[in-house]
């Protein structure tokens, strides 16, 4: 398990398709955590790749 992972499900990070790693600090999945990121989002600034419009963001709200 990634020591930087704050995920509560399973023993490893699993963020494909959704942001289950709320802190986005897991090197193994942080790039797929956020579907979108508003300007100034500290979580996504740590490495999340934004894949949608910021007005639909749920992981950095």
Curated annotation (Swiss-Prot):
Metallothioneins have a high content of cysteine residues that bind various heavy metals; these proteins are transcriptionally regulated by both heavy metals and glucocorticoids. It comes from the Eukaryota. The gene is MT1C. This is Metallothionein-1C. Keywords: Metal-binding, Metal-thiolate cluster. Transmembrane segments: none annotated. Belongs to the metallothionein superfamily. Type 1 family. A divalent metal cation 3 binds at residues 15, 19, 24, 29. Residues 1-29 are annotated as: Beta. A divalent metal cation 2 binds at residues 7, 13, 15, 26. Class I metallothioneins contain 2 metal-binding domains: four divalent ions are chelated within cluster A of the alpha domain and are coordinated via cysteinyl thiolate bridges to 11 cysteine ligands. Cluster B, the corresponding region within the beta domain, can ligate three divalent ions to 9 cysteines. A divalent metal cation 4 binds at residues 33-34, 44, 48. It comes from Ovis aries (Sheep). One of its GO terms (cellular component) is nucleus. PANTHER family: METALLOTHIONEIN (PTHR23299), METALLOTHIONEIN-1G (PTHR23299:SF22). A divalent metal cation 7 binds at residues 50, 57, 59-60.
């Amino acid at each position: 398990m990634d020591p930087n992972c704050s995920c509560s499900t399973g023993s490893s990070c699993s963020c494909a398709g959704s942001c289950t790693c709320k802190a986005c600090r897991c090197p193994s999945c942080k790039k797929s955590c956020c579907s979108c990121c508003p300007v100034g989002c500290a979580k996504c600034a740590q490495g999340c790749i934004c894949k949608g419009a910021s007005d639909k963001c749920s992981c950095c709200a």
